[in-house]
Amino acid sequence: MKLKTTLLGKTYVFQSVKEVLAKANEEKTGDKLAGLAAESAQERVAAKVVLSALTLGDLRENPAVPYGTDEVTRIIQDDVNEAVYRKIRGWSVAELREWILDEKTTSSQIRHLSRGLTSEMVAAVAKLMSNLDLIYAAQKMPVTATCNTTIGLPGTLSCRLQPNHTTDDPDGITASVLEGLSFGAGDAVIGLNPVTDSPEQVGKVLRRFQEIKERWEIPTQICVLAHITAQMKAVKAGAPCDLIFQSIAGSEAGNAAFGFNADTVAQARELLLRDGTAMGPNVLYFETGQGSELSSNAHHGTDQVTMEARCYGFAKRFQPFLVNTVVGFIGPEYLYDARQVTRAGLEDHFMGKLTGVSMGCDCCYTNHMKADQNDIENLASLLTLAGCNYFMGIPHGDDIMLNYQTTGFRETAALREITGKTAIAEFQQWLEKMGFSENGRLTAKAGDGSSLLF
């Protein structure tokens, strides 16, 4: 294993695989904050050169966090298909990149090979790709999952309807839900971030969602994005629930900071498969985002792209229906501007798809970040080309409860029309039955949620 290279007469020496991974990263303020970033563009290129020559075996043998001290590492390593890994362990990261991008390499071949990868390998190959590489590669890797409906099929683009409200008022929530449905949002999930994180409030909102779903016979999923334990208590108390949600991190310490561990997730999955309202096998929803481990001092000296890839390795164990990065939510301390947010969104989507999870993206930014709505529309457009499974849908893209900006109802509708994609088939049929869509396009009735009331 060679950890040095000479460029233009200057020799660059790296002390570990972890340092190579960090310094090969595209520029991120979070890595600078952690003291891990390359000090110059030249050092970044040198790290990429070294990384390109490392073998997949080198990366397997040097996980970001030791196996003996971290359950996320154990999950990632234990879930590797050893027969597949043995065939590729001698490949360099550069060879893996070339193989994925080769036009002769098929989706099924990539899916099979991905079973032999660890998250560090996934992160490594992402670091050697341009933005267009990430888009081209990701669109070769469709990933589907089934709850009440099946998400991720080619030709579809889905949307989470996010009817957040500042006081969790049921009527206010309902108004946002009906408006979103009329725009074609909500086929991925109708999912609310509650103000009050209690089992009682979770149950109250879930029952309202279930009433809406049953009254208008909507083929979709419902979820309230409270803490995982609050949702479990609500389900045990009899609340209807299709999906249980949790934010996840790429280390055991990061998950502990969120207040859960792998056993908690396993118990939630078992509970929902037994007592939930979903018809399919995929009953979990995870959110991630570059930099969350650093914010809880749980990054173990590892760069934020590698830690993000480890989130997907953890998620895969539990066969989720939905996984999405909330790409610009943490702020400029981790992703400084639109350029960094765009890069992170493309990286995250590619890494999730290569890992094998049903990957979406909350294309978003905070008010103090150097980004605006045009930048977020740019990212959503690029991710649509990349085959992203779903985006968020919030009234006018302005979340008045979480106080950040993301995509609205109209963006997904426009992107579907531009690319010839539709909502999930059963939901698309419902839209046409209700008069909101005709021949794959929204009608004049779209946007009038009150039409569902009369």
Where are these regions (language model features)?
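Anaerobic metallocofactor- and corrinoid-dependent redox/one-carbon enzyme cores
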Residues: M1-T174, S182, V189-F454
